[in-house]
UniProtKB/Swiss-Prot annotation:
Pathway: Amino-acid biosynthesis; L-tryptophan biosynthesis; L-tryptophan from chorismate: step 4/5. It comes from Dichelobacter nodosus (strain VCS1703A). It catalyses: 1-(2-carboxyphenylamino)-1-deoxy-D-ribulose 5-phosphate + H(+) = (1S,2R)-1-C-(indol-3-yl)glycerol 3-phosphate + CO2 + H2O. Its EC number is 4.1.1.48. This is Indole-3-glycerol phosphate synthase. The lineage of its organism: Bacteria, Pseudomonadati, Pseudomonadota, Gammaproteobacteria, Cardiobacteriales.
């Protein structure tokens, strides 16, 4: 792992330990027994959009990022979510990490109530506890980052998430991650175009890694997607969907920005 990811994991370990002091894993499991709602199909929504000939987009709702700083002064996740769905997002992603991305689980809960589309929890998941918590929060899909997990954790966490009815998105950064991801029983991958060491993004990473994956994998490109030309380039390279955050959150009107990214600006 890089120094940045090491720091994030160390902080997460402390965060989870504190959460367990407030509520035990056994308590979470007991609460899960009372759930009656079923998760929305995150992957199904993206596949359906792609198969209809549309541009499958995951719009990311986030307040800030380590490389860009604060993206929105006025941050109203429910309204942003509604706007993005209105303008073409098939699914949403919500950052719940508080320390590095100024996210919050409350943002995710608010978004789930505001829109009918599936929602991905964007966080650094390193524990069973977070997966159980995710289901209780109404999460439809969790993100597992290969670089911060062992092979054993990847297998265990995928099984647990699926047992709870949630979809799983596996995130990779490089060829080493890709090789490990091929051993995980999930055929939905996200290629993060950003270098975790310096945060520079290269769309060519998605193009190159996609060619090394089996054709039946559903592959999402994320990070550094800022223009309609970027979206067209990635789709032409065989990517199945795109996840867009910063370009939307930094725009005055997120929905209009999304429309332009999908369809291009009108003359």
């Amino acid at each position: 792992m890089t120094k940045i990811l090491d720091d994030i994991v160390a902080y997460k370990q402390q965060e989870i330990a504190a959460l367990k002091q407030q509520k035990t894993e056994a308590s979470l499991i007991a609460e899960l027994e009372t759930l009656t709602d079923a998760p929305r199909g995150f992957m199904r929504a993206l596949r359906d959009c792609r198969d209809r000939g549309g541009v499958a987009v995951v719009a990311e709702i986030k307040r800030a990022s380590p490389n860009q700083g604060l993206l929105r002064e006025q941050f109203m996740p429910e309204l942003l979510a509604q706007e993005c769905v209105q303008y073409g997002a098939s699914c949403l992603s919500v950052f719940t990490d508080t320390h590095f991305f100024y996210g919050d689980v409350a943002y995710l809960s608010a978004v789930k109530k505001a829109v009918p589309v599936p929602v991905l929890r964007k966080d650094f998941i390193i524990s069973r506890y977070q997966i159980l918590e995710s289901r209780l929060l109404g999460v439809d899909c969790i993100l597992l980052i290969v670089a911060i997990l062992t092979d054993e954790q990847l297998q265990e966490f995928v099984v647990l998430a699926h047992d709870l009815g949630m979809d799983v998105l596996i995130e990779i950064h490089d060829e080493n991650d890709l090789k490990r991801a091929l051993n995980v029983p999930v055929r939905t991958l996200a290629i993060n175009n950003r270098n975790p060491e310096d945060f520079n993004a290269s769309l060519e990473k998605s193009a190159q890694l996609r060619q090394q994956l089996p054709k039946d994998y559903f592959v999402i490109s994320e990070s550094g997607i800022n223009t309609h030309a970027d979206v067209v380039y990635l789709l032409n390279c065989g990517l199945d969907a795109v996840l867009i955050g910063g370009a939307l959150m930094s725009a005055e009107f997120a929905g209009e920005a999304l429309h332009h990214l999908i369809y291009g600006k009108e003359d």
